[in-house]
Structure formats: C-alpha cells, structure tokens
Amino acid sequence: MKRYSVCVGDTVYVLAGNDKGKQGKVLSCLREKNKVVVEGVNVRTKNIKRSQENPKGKRISIEAPIHVSNVRLSIDGAPAKLSVKVTENGRELWNKSPDGTSKLYRSVKERKG
C-alpha cells in the first residue's frame, strides 16, 4: 500500500478540479482507493427519501473523496513540496523552501505488516 505525505488532520491545498485553489482539513484517508476526504471540498448534495423519521425527506451536503494526487500539503498557506528520507528509526518528511533550505516537517515510524 502506498504511503502518503498527508494524514488525517493535515491542512491541504487542492491542485486540480472544480475546487482548485481551496484549502481544507483532511477528514479521512481511503487508502484502498487512493483518495482523501477534505473538509469543504468536492461537496455533493444527497437526497434522503421520505420515512417515518423524516416525513418530508431532506437534502444533505456531504464531502465526496478526491484523488490523493490532486492535493498537496499546505504549509504557511501555500502548497509545499516534501521529500522523503528514510532513516534508521523511521521515515522523515522534509519541506523544501524556495530559498533552497530544507526543514524537517514530520518524522513517521514505519508500520510493520
């Protein structure tokens, strides 16, 4: 299974699609489908049928998943390029700034199995 540079709770920047340029928080990662659900992005309207609980029925808005390649981690309000370096105690994600310097963003332990 592919490892992502974004995880639940991160703020991401949308790179492509109808919501290009928007930012939002990652609500969930669907790793088997390579998709993420982002708060306030790719909002769809769903119709709920009439039932005894909802005699009139209703319409609700839900966030639909988007492909992980269409989002990038947002650092200081702009999309950031991250490079992955593997160390002896796990994986580290480095943020490359425009001036050429690198700064440690996150250190992640590898999962077994």
Swiss-Prot record:
GO biological process: translation
InterPro entries on file: KOW, Rib_uL2_dom2, Ribosomal_uL24, Ribosomal_uL24_CS, Ribosomal_uL24_KOW, Translation_prot_SH3-like_sf
Signal sequence coordinates: none
GO molecular-function terms, A-Z: rRNA binding; structural constituent of ribosome
SMART domains the UniProt entry points to: KOW
Gene3D superfamilies hit by this protein: 2.30.30.30
CDD domains: KOW_RPL26
Keywords: Ribonucleoprotein, Ribosomal protein, RNA-binding, rRNA-binding
Keyword Transmembrane attributed: no
SUPFAM superfamilies in alphabetical order: Translation proteins SH3-like domain
GO cellular component, one term: ribonucleoprotein complex
Family of the protein in this entry: Belongs to the universal ribosomal protein uL24 family.
Function per UniProt: One of two assembly initiator proteins, it binds directly to the 5'-end of the 23S rRNA, where it nucleates assembly of the 50S subunit.
Complex formation: Part of the 50S ribosomal subunit.
Entry protein name: Large ribosomal subunit protein uL24
Species this chain originates from: Chlamydia caviae (strain ATCC VR-813 / DSM 19441 / 03DC25 / GPIC)
Organism phylogeny: Bacteria, Pseudomonadati, Chlamydiota, Chlamydiia, Chlamydiales
